[in-house]
Structures are given as structure tokens and as C-alpha cells.
Amino acid sequence: MEEFQGYFELDRSRQHDFLYPLLFREYIYALAHDHGLNRSILFENAGYDKKSSSIIVKRLITRMYQQNPLIFSANDSIQNPFFGHNKNLYSQIISEGFAVIVEIPFSLRLVSSLERKEIAKSHNLRSIHSIFPFLEDKFSHLDYVSDVLIPYHIHLEISVQTLRYWVKDASSLHLLRFFLHEYWNSLITPKKHITLFSKGNPRLFLFLYNSHICEYESIFLFLRNQSSHLRSTSSGIFFERIYFYVKIEHFAKVFFDNDFQCILWFFKDPFMHYVRYQGKSILALKDTPLLMNKWKYYLVTLWQYHFYAWFQPGRIDINQLCKYSLDFLGYRSSVRLNSSVVRSQILENSFLINNAMKKFETIVPIIPLIGSLSKANFCNTLGHPISKPTRADSSDSDIIDRFLRICRNLSHYHSGSSKKKSLYRVKYILRLSCVKTLARKHKRTVRTFLKRLGSEFLEEFLTEEEVVLSLIFPRTYSTSRRLYRGQIWYFDITSINDLVNYE
């Protein structure tokens, strides 16, 4: 963010509304390509003048408004070899530059929001693992859950209209509209339930998707706050609603005294808990499935009439949390009942007390993970380790370092698992696959090569957590072992490992 403010020197009150002139700045495209500001981003040429990039971008935008933007003159191909290599390359350049520009108002608004709310260590909230402590704290007290796929609208105009609430520059919005209509077919790839954006232009379309999600969640949050039963709200705006609850209570006492609590909960909405991940969302509530059905039709109506995205109510399943497992972000999460029997004795009388407590558990699903390892040629489909083909010039240390890095990354990501058995199996597969790879390279048997490496090789596959705990508790091995078996969540994980992403 400091880099943006240093380059653009934007005034937060006015100047960031006029984004169109920034399209003709050299450093915009340098930032988009993560290049230095002293290097050309269109093609490598020591004598290339920075002012030429502005001329090129102006020509590209002008031809976008023409009837056939893919026709180039001979002079353009001779003077600028950039035009002659790929006819669709300039659409990628403009989209990347435009993505950097439209992110500026959102970035400034995010920074000002964090400063205003005084959120300490806000970078921890970006971690994938930050979701799971929230689930541990909340989900053990809930009863019903729905795992919902968030639909994405197909019509291009809705994407532009959504941005109108955030970007006030009409010229930029007109350019975006022309760009999307001209190159929509070449920039997206239809797949299954959602439109996946091509790898050539991920930044712009990720921005459009996130702006769509931001609009949807802002409306959803408003509905959620309005329908909650005001446990933590004391605002004068809701006095009428509170008075309505008082009348309900009086009505229930007079006519339905026996079922007073049930009648009152029928009118009052419990607090809705919401989690979003990878284009999906989790909704969870306490008490009755009737309220989950009501929220289901809220969402279907919102998607169909506000975002014009067709969605069938039958695709939203309502499940009991104690009988359902959530598979997301490489974990299988569920709420289990743990019963504990306590024997109590008072004088001569003794009796047993059976306590049932709900506990949120996260485990590593071994079958999908073995499938990912099989696709990467670490094992076969049954989970038996195999040798991985390597380059002839790869040294033994390079091969070992690669396997160690994969093993430690997986262990680091799955450190929050409440059961480590699946993780031990994955480490065994990677360790034996490494030995088989080295034995294949040196044309020896696995047994002979393993004797040559010795026990020190096996110790290298210890994860960072095991090494640190062994240093803290060098004498009490059982203590460090017990601590390692517990759940550890890290707030520095911002991306999913390719082997963990089963989507």
C-alpha cells in the first residue's frame, strides 16, 4: 500500500475517483508485471523510450473502440514488434493495468477502515488458519449447517454496475464495459458450475469476482443484522421491533403458556454464523431447521432478483451439524459428542454422572491427499510409495531438499489436525518415495541404500514443530510428544498447497 501511495500521491477525498488518466502511466504496467520502474514492460529493448508505452496504450484503447480492433497496420508491426507477436496480447496488458488501477480505491478504503477500527495484527486475519479457531469457538454450540455454492452472474453489465458503487470514474467504467464485451469469450473458460478465468488475465477477473462477493456479502450482512434478535444491539432504530417482541411475549403468556419459549423462538431469529471459502459459504444456526429454510429462500431470492443468477432452492441442503462433516481447505471438520463419566459419592451414596460435551474436530482426509500424491507421482493409487523420475543432473542433496520441503509444508499446513495418524502416513510415503528415488538414481536396492543413509536421514524428516518442541523439552520426551499431538494453528499461511487443493 505504501508503494501505491508513493507512486500516485492520491488524495483520499477526491483524486482517486479519476482513474482513467492512470492508464497512460508507465509505472502502472511495471507494477502489474512486478517489474522495476527502470525496465520496459512491453519488450526488452535498452533504447526503448518510456513515453512510447503511453503512445502504445493510447493506440490500443483507440482500436478497442473501433469496429475491428484486431487489424494492425504494417507500420505498427515494423515499428513495434510487440504488435506482431500476438494479436490478443495487448488485451492482456490493458486488463492487467486496469486491474491495478481499480484496486486503488479498494486498497485505500481497506487501510482507512483498519486504521479507524484499530484492528491489531490485521495480517493474521488473512491467514487460512484463522477460520478454524473461529469454528472451534462457535460451531460446538450450533445445531444446523448448510454448505452453499455461491453463484456467479453471467451477464457482463452486472459486473460493471456493481463497480459503479465503488468507482465514480465514468470513463474507466466505459472502458471496462467495452473491454469485457470485446474479449469475454477469449478470457474465460466455462467449467462445471462456475466460470473459471483464464490464466492469462487472472488479476482483473479475480477483482471482478471479489467485488461481486463484496456486494453480495454487504447485502447479506444487512439482512443478518436486521433479523437477529438484538442480543448486543441497543439502538433507537429498533425500538419498534423490541416493542413487537414485548407484545409477542404477552400474547404467548396469555394463550400459549405451556409452549411459551417455543412460540417466542419462532418469531426471534438466532444469530446466523457465516464463513466463506473458495467460492462457497457455510451457514450455521442454533435450534430449529425452520429458520435455516427461511434463510435459504432469502438467499435464493437475493441471487435471482438482485444479481440475476439462477439458483434452485433444492441445491441448498440443511444438515444436522452432529451428523455432517465439512470438507474444505484441506480439512474434514465435524462436531462430535464426547461423553465422560464422573463418579460422585456423598457419604454412603454414590452415583455416576454422564456428561456429553460437543467438540469441534478437524482431521486430514487421507483418501483425497493420497490421490494428490498419486497424481504427483509420489505413490500409486493405493498409497504405496514409488520412485519419482528426476533429472540426470540433480544431486542427492537437491532431491532430499525437495522431498523435505514438501513434507514440512504439508505438516505445517495440517498442524491443526486433531488426529495425526493420516499425517504420519503421508510422511511415510514421502520418506520412502525419496529413498526409492535415490536408489533408482544410483541403481541400488532400497534396503542397501537405506543402510547407507542411516538413521540421520530419517531424522531430517522431522517437522519444524517436532524439532522446536524437542529443544524446549529435551528431557521430557513424552511431554513434547503430547504437545505435538495437539492442534496448532499458524497465522502465516495465506495460500493452499497444491497437494491440499482437492477442488
Curated annotation (Swiss-Prot):
| Major place of residence | plastid
| Keyword Protein biosynthesis on entry | no
Q: What are the BP-aspect GO terms?
A: mRNA processing; RNA splicing; tRNA processing
Recorded hits in InterPro entries, A to Z, give:
Domain_X (IPR024937), Maturase_MatK (IPR002866), Maturase_MatK_N (IPR024942)
Regions crossing the membrane:
none
Q: Which UniProt keywords apply?
A: Chloroplast, mRNA processing, Plastid, RNA-binding, tRNA processing
Where does this polypeptide localize? Answer: Plastid, Chloroplast
One GO term of the cellular component aspect? chloroplast
Q: Name one GO molecular function term.
A: RNA binding
- Tell me which family the UniProt entry assigns to this protein: Belongs to the intron maturase 2 family. MatK subfamily.
Q: What does the function comment of this entry state?
A: Usually encoded in the trnK tRNA gene intron. Probably assists in splicing its own and other chloroplast group II introns.
* Name of protein: Maturase K
Organism listed in the record:
Syzygium anisatum (Aniseed myrtle)
Q: Which gene encodes it?
A: matK
